[in-house]
Amino acid sequence: MTTDQITLRSPAPDEMRAFFGPIADAFSEDMSEPEFDTERRLLEPERCVSAFDGDRRVGSSAAYSFRLTVPGGEVGAAGITGVGVLPDHRRRGILRQMMAWLHDDAIRRGEAVAVLGASEGAIYQRFGYGQGTTTSTFSLDPAHARFRDPVPPDPSRRIRMVDEDEAARIFPMVYDAVRGDIPGAVGRSEDKWRLYMLGDAD
């Protein structure tokens, strides 16, 4: 796809390191090798798009494939992620072109929904996005953490530590058992569980 000398295309598998360049620059962040390896394992190159001004990569974005719970079932969804345009190429319609590319790709795949997590949500209202939820992160000091209500002892119920392999087997089953009852819950791939939920980014 070419518009006003800006060309869009998916990166080849051996271009994935370069693909992340505009995203890292747009957020003023360096991507470590472990972070790159994590993202490389999660993203599908054919769902990634870069914008080029001549031979220079000036923007990048991507979409994850996942299943989204909706009332009555689940649908395929595109998880838009990593939207970045270099500062010297902003206000030239590159974001709009990449979003159109990702949306068209989602339509071709039969995906009914596109979602994204945004650092600046107002940017994406022009593309039809609205706030669906918020996120919060909490840290608990184990020395002072308590159940809200006392839990009566029950010898038939036990708590035990599990290693990563067992967690990777059990946690997805528990999650998937309840996910179907929670509209807006997202399916997670095995790699997503291992790399993000269980912390194996090596």
Language-model region placement:
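Short, low-complexity, intrinsically disordered N-terminal peptides in bacterial proteins
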Residues: 1-7
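A conserved beta-strand-loop-helix scaffold within acyl/acetyltransferase catalytic domains
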Residues: 8-83, 175-202
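Short beta->alpha linker loops
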Residues: 14, 118-119, 166, 188
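Conserved acetyl-CoA-binding loop-helix of GNAT-fold acetyltransferases
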Residues: 82-107
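Residue-level signal for alpha-helix termini/capping positions
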Residues: 107-108, 201
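Conserved active-site alpha-helix within GNAT-family acetyltransferase domains
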Residues: 108-112, 117-137
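Amide-forming acyltransferase catalytic core, primarily the GNAT-like/NAT-type
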Residues: 135-202
